[in-house]
């Protein structure tokens, strides 16, 4: 899947729930963005896959293209922490619900032509 009006940030991110759901996704940014995300996380292990789905789509339904969760509190409060796995070490990390850059293979969250 190409990024169409978006630009690929030049890496893949693997989403896992620890069991069966593993997916390689093009990580894109809109052409209007100045840079790519600055985290170095390559593998992200979510406590619960369905929780990630709910959180992600809830994020997409928020008003505007740029929506952030508040200091690590997911869009579904109290649902539990999101764990990033980096270098085989699990650690809590602020959930980024920004809808642009977007995960183009999951949903198109940027306005066409922007």
From Swiss-Prot:
Instruction: List the keywords (alphabetical).
Output: Disulfide bond, Ion channel impairing toxin, Neurotoxin, Secreted, Toxin
- Keyword Secreted belongs to the record: yes
PTM entry text: Contains 6 disulfide bonds.
Cytoplasm recorded as keyword: no
Any Gene Ontology CC annotation: extracellular region
Any single GO molecular-function term of the entry would be: toxin activity
Q: In which tissues is it expressed?
A: Expressed by the venom duct.
Q: Where in the cell is it found?
A: Secreted
User: What does the entry note on its domains?
Assistant: The cysteine framework is C-C-C-C-C-C-C-C-C-C-CC.
Described function: Acts as a neurotoxin by inhibiting an ion channel.
Designated name of the protein: Turripeptide OL22
* Native source organism of the sequence: Iotyrris olangoensis (Sea snail)
């Amino acid at each position: 899947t190409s990024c169409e009006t978006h630009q690929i940030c030049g890496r893949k991110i693997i989403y896992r729930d620890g069991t069966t759901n593993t997916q390689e996704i093009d990580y894109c940014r809109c052409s209007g963005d100045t840079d790519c995300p600055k985290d170095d996380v390559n593998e992200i292990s979510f406590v619960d896959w369905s929780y990630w789905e709910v959180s992600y789509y809830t994020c997409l339904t928020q008003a505007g293209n740029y929506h952030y969760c508040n200091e690590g509190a997911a869009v579904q409060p109290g649902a539990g922490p999101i764990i990033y796995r980096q270098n085989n070490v699990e650690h809590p990390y602020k959930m980024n619900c920004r809808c642009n850059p977007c995960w183009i293979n999951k949903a198109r969250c940027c306005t066409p032509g922007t």
